[in-house]
């Protein structure tokens, strides 16, 4: 895949340019991510803060995750699309929630690990050969 790539929220008010492939991509099955995504998991692409540039104003909220980590969430104030999360203890890592859409990037955003599988719905089957963690 050729970088940089761009993506935008549903209304287009918030966008980003990603200059490098994600460090890693995971699928999180925790209950919070199931609520966020309205599906059995949400995808998180971990990227270096220096490799991504955001445009547009975002709102934020914070909570303590089940892991005990602080989770600061950024989202579009107009359409509500979640853009990214950041843990203040790891400020150089962006946990990107909004992935670029397009066939050419699919492989770069395929999850290599599924986390919080202890909370996944019983009917969802993780593909054979993918690493799993019951928690994080």
Give the residues covered by each predicted segment.
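A short Gly-Trp-Pro
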Residues: 1-8, 13-136
């Amino acid at each position: 895949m050729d970088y940089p790539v761009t993506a935008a929220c549903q209304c287009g008010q918030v966008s980003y340019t990603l200059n490098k492939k994600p460090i890693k991509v995971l699928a999180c099955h925790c209950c919070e991510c199931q609520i966020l995504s309205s599906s059995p998991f949400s995808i998180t692409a971990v990227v270096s803060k220096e490799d991504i540039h955001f445009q547009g104003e975002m709102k934020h909220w914070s909570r303590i995750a089940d892991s005990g980590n602080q989770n600061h969430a950024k989202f579009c104030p107009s359409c509500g699309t979640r853009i990214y999360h950041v843990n203040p203890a790891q400020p150089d890592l962006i946990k990107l929630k909004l992935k670029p859409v397009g066939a050419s990037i699919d492989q770069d955003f395929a999850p290599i690990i599924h986390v919080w599988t202890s909370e996944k719905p019983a009917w969802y089957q993780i593909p054979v050969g993918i690493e799993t963690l019951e928690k994080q």
